[in-house]
Amino acid sequence: KELKQSPVANLSNALAGKLPGLITVQTSGQPGEDASSLFIRGVGTYGTSNPLVVIDGLPRSQTDFNQLDANEIESVTILKDASSSSLYGIQGANGVIVVTTKRGVDREKPLISFTVQQAVQQPIRLPETMSSYEQALYYRDMDMNDGQTERYTPEVLDIIKNGSDPYLYPNVNWFDEILKKNSMQSQYNINISGSALGKLRYFISGSYVNQGTLLKHQDIFEKNYGVKSKFDRYNFRSNVDLDATSMLNIRIDLAGRLETRVGPGSDFSNVFSVITTRSPSSQPVFNPDGTLGAGSALEIPFQQNPYGIVTQSGYYTRHTNVMSGTLSAKHKLDFITKGLSAQVYFSFESNNYQHTTRLQSFDSFWYKGKDATGEAIYQPHSVKSRLSTTDSRWVERYTYLDVRLNYDRTFAEKHQISAQLLGNRTLRSQNAELPYAYQGISSRIAYNFDTRYYLEANIGYNGSENFPPKKRYGFFPSFSAGWVLSDEKFISLPSWIQLIKLRGSYGTVGNDKIGGQRWLYITEFTPGGTAMGTYQFGVSPQSVAGYNESRVGNKFVTWEKSAKGNVGFDLSLFKDNAVQFTFDYFWEKRNNILTTPGDVPDYVGITNVAPRNSGKVENKGIEAELRFNKRINKDLSIFANLQMTYARNKVLENDEPIP
């Protein structure tokens, strides 16, 4: 419900401020490219810090997560400590985001909901820029302080101040000229859920999102190229559950996504870079004859006109098609022992990308004033060219196989035991590359007595083909414990205290996203084509190409290792747990971070030193959350949520040279 209340096209932005320990950083406002970077409990490595994303029990990319429609989602959970993430072993060091999508429930009639959201997007903050006159005064003071001849005479300063000659002495606020104050965003969604025949449950969702651009002059851009800057996305999801027998449940999930991005030939970030660094006096937007300006009496032309970049530099189109399917079956094995079940997942995902860029230069002229006869003087700066076309296409394929044994049983009404044994394998291929492969075995066992004492142990044994044969697998254990003090009979508490729980965990996890190239343990050789890469043979010496060692392999390269600890408590107060408070203190020591050695001197003669796992980072902090939820009556409730996360890291070792 909270996610749906945020009118954003990208799910990562909807999570801002919603979950304690999750930090979101948005760095772009480009339509369709405005995803936030996600960090769980700060940054524990100077390598890759992206968390693992799991959707409906299966690992997915963060892009899949970003482009989910909030109306499809039942819940989002963050796994932060080692105990909760160690099942993911080699991929769990940066934390895990677990998403559960909605499913059908038994009901007499289908439930149909239709949602429409209209939103206005606007920049949070833009730089305040100098005017040409303020800039001229700044330069005058600088010249005076340096004892230099002032570059602007009093007469020129008056012209700049009065704006009497805007072509030779322009004053352009490029942010106002290029950016709109706001843009529109539209979202439409329809959900249908229900059941049939007493055995079938279904959830079907479809949505459409459109984001407009913050760039001005789109009428000119559309007139020039017949396209409109935008981001369109269509989402589809179908989750079906079938009780084939009283013992067998089958799930069939299908999901798809179609995306289209269109924009000016110059990248959106480049447009921002241009208008941020462009001087207000660099050039007028237009010359007196209506051509694009390229210089002024104050600055020689050396940069392209921002208006031309937005409207006449070409355009790009990017199409993304994603289709995924999951088939799973769960069978109860009560005939072996009560509470035992087996479950198998098979998932397939296909991603197709097509990017087309059509670029061209445009006409612009430097207006240099008038000659003695009163004729305008123009000097060409850039000349319009034909559109050049660049196409790129690539395909990604994911397959995932997961087999699980689950056990959940309560003995004597007070002893509850749950356990899981899991084996999985993931293959990801891109175009003609050799596939990336992961596989492993994980297990979990949890025990609680009378919902007062909790113990849990997890073990992960996972590996990746990216590492040397003898270093591909790692062992990742963890454990956790909890104690509900408020349920103890020997502790007397006021009636308004509903819950006091202490908890702690410790364990190790890994991170295989170490950066660098694939298979760093392999030494590579390339043919030599220069005098340094040839050999002389024969009576009459002939040059024969040899091979150079282009990359030195590191046969000890491995994943990052993280030791994590966490202690905290939960507190609930008043009737219906109206006030809830949680507090956690966490710490992490990350080792084996891939680092380029800095302590190998040049005189050794090795210019391409193999990276090695020598980096170390320490990260620790606290997080707290205070929630208030009070239902006044059936139509009115009050909700408030206050969160705080503080994380501080320290680089302990970066393989730097010793001074």
Describe the residue ranges of each PLM region:
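Compositionally biased, intrinsically disordered linkers/stalks adjacent to structured regions
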Residues: G265, P288, S392-V395
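Short, compositionally biased small/polar motifs
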Residues: F272-V274
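Extracytoplasmic gating/loop element in the C-terminal half of outer-membrane beta-barrel translocons
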Residues: N145-R151, S164, P284-T291, F302-Q304, ...
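Short, solvent-exposed beta-strand-terminating loops
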Residues: I124-R125, S207, Q354-F365
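Short, small/polar-rich motifs associated with maturation and membrane association
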Residues: K1-F236, I250, I638-A640
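Short, solvent-exposed loop/turn motifs
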Residues: P59, T149, L292-G293, A376
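Extracellular/periplasmic, surface-exposed regions of secreted and cell-surface proteins
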Residues: N50, S186, N239-L248, L254-L258, ...
